[in-house]
C-alpha cells in the first residue's frame, strides 16, 4: 500500500487529527498512477538530487525517495513534520526542512546534500496560491536547477508554456521561457485530490537552457518592457508604452525612434510579439535613452 492510496491517506489524516489549512493551499494527491507518471516524466534516478516543495504527508516524496539519490522536502506547515517523520521513516535519503521555500537560504541549504555536486531537479505539487512567486524565485536564483517537473493549476501551466498570438501568452510566458523550455506533460483532473480543488491541474516540465533564449543589454529593463506590453491586452503596444513611459513629447519621440529601430509597428498588440521582438524593443528603447 502506498501513502497516496485513498484509504491510507485517510487513515493517516484521521490518526493525526489533521485538518486542512486553506491558507497553505493544501490538496493531497491520492492517485498512485499519476505519481508514477510524475517521477517518470522527471526521469529521476540515483544520479540526481531532488528538491520537493510542499510534500504534504509524503505521497510524492515516497516515489521520489525510491528513485533519487536524495530528496530535500520543504514544508511550511509544522504540523506535517511529525507526520512526514512517520510516513517516511523507512527512507534514510530524505530531509524534511520546515521552512518557507521563499525565505530559505537555498545556497546554504543545498550543501546539506551528501553529494551536493549532483544535478538538482525540482519536482513538486506546488500550492496554487503561490505557484508563480515560487517558480520565479527558483528560476531567477543563481542555482543551476537542471529541470522542473511541477504540478500547478492548468491555467497557469497554459500561461507559462504559451506561444505568441494566443490568449494565454503574456509576460509570465516570457519570464519563464527566457530561462527555460516549458511544455505541459499531462493534465491531472481535480477529482484525484483530497480535498478536491476547484480547477484541474497540469504537470509542467521545464528544462533550463544552457544560455538564456536571447541576449539583451539589460535583463531587468527587458522584463519591464515585456510586462508593459501586456498591461492592457486589448490596447496597442504604443498606448501601453505611452501609459508607462509618459506622454511628454520628448518621450513620445524617443518611443517612436525606439520602435522604428526595433522594426516594430506601434499599432501591434503585445501578444503578437515574440520574446525576440521584446528583446529587440528593449535594447532599442535603451539605446534611445529610455
UniProtKB/Swiss-Prot annotation:
One GO CC term on file: cytosol
Catalysed reactions listed for this entry: adenosine(1518)/adenosine(1519) in 16S rRNA + 4 S-adenosyl-L-methionine = N(6)-dimethyladenosine(1518)/N(6)-dimethyladenosine(1519) in 16S rRNA + 4 S-adenosyl-L-homocysteine + 4 H(+)
Annotated compartments: Cytoplasm
CDD domains xrefs: AdoMet_MTases
Keywords, in A-Z order: Cytoplasm, Methyltransferase, RNA-binding, rRNA processing, S-adenosyl-L-methionine, Transferase
Designated name of the protein: Ribosomal RNA small subunit methyltransferase A
EC number: 2.1.1.182
NCBIfam families, per database record: ksgA (TIGR00755)
SMART domains reported for this sequence: rADc (SM00650)
Keyword Methyltransferase: yes
Function statement: Specifically dimethylates two adjacent adenosines (A1518 and A1519) in the loop of a conserved hairpin near the 3'-end of 16S rRNA in the 30S particle. May play a critical role in biogenesis of 30S subunits.
Superkingdom, natural source: Bacteria
Source organism: Streptococcus equi subsp. zooepidemicus (strain MGCS10565)
UniProt family annotation: Belongs to the class I-like SAM-binding methyltransferase superfamily. rRNA adenine N(6)-methyltransferase family. RsmA subfamily.
Originating gene: rsmA
Binding positions (S-adenosyl-L-methionine): 27, 29, 54, 75, 100, 125
A UniProt-annotated Pfam family: RrnaAD
Amino acid at each position: 500500500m502506498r501513502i497516496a492510496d485513498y484509504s491510507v491517506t485517510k487513515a493517516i489524516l484521521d490518526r493525526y487529527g489533521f485538518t486542512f489549512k486553506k491558507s497553505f493551499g493544501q490538496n493531497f494527491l491520492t492517485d498512485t498512477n499519476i505519481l508514477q507518471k510524475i517521477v517518470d516524466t522527471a526521469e529521476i534516478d540515483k544520479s540526481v538530487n531532488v528538491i520537493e516543495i510542499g510534500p504534504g504527508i509524503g505521497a510524492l516524496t515516497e516515489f521520489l525517495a525510491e528513485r533519487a539519490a536524495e530528496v530535500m522536502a520543504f514544508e511550511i506547515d509544522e504540523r506535517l513534520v511529525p507526520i512526514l517523520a512517520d510516513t517516511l521513516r523507512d527512507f534514510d535519503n530524505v530531509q524534511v526542512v520546515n521552512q518557507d521555500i521563499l525565505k530559505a537560504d537555498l545556497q546554504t541549504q543545498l550543501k546539506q546534500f551528501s553529494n551536493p555536486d549532483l544535478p538538482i531537479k525540482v519536482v513538486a505539487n506546488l500550492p496554487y496560491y503561490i505557484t508563480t512567486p515560487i517558480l520565479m524565485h527558483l528560476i531567477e536564483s543563481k542555482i543551476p536547477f537542471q529541470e522542473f517537473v511541477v504540478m500547478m493549476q492548468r491555467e497557469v501551466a497554459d500561461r507559462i508554456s504559451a506561444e505568441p498570438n494566443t490568449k494565454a501568452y503574456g509576460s509570465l510566458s516570457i519570464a519563464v521561457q527566457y530561462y527555460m523550455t516549458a511544455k505541459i506533460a499531462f493534465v491531472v483532473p481535480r477529482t484525484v485530490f483530497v480535498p478536491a480543488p476547484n480547477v484541474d491541474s497540469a504537470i509542467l516540465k521545464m528544462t533550463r537552457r544552457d544560455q538564456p533564449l536571447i541576449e539583451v543589454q539589460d535583463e531587468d529593463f527587458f522584463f519591464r518592457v515585456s510586462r508593459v506590453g501586456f498591461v492592457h491586452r486589448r490596447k496597442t503596444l504604443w498606448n501601453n508604452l505611452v501609459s508607462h513611459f509618459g506622454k511628454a513629447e520628448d518621450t513620445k519621440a524617443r518611443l517612436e525612434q525606439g520602435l522604428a529601430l526595433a522594426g516594430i509597428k506601434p499599432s501591434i498588440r503585445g501578444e503578437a510579439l515574440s520574446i525576440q521582438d521584446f528583446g529587440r524593443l528593449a535594447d532599442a528603447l535603451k539605446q534611445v535613452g529610455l
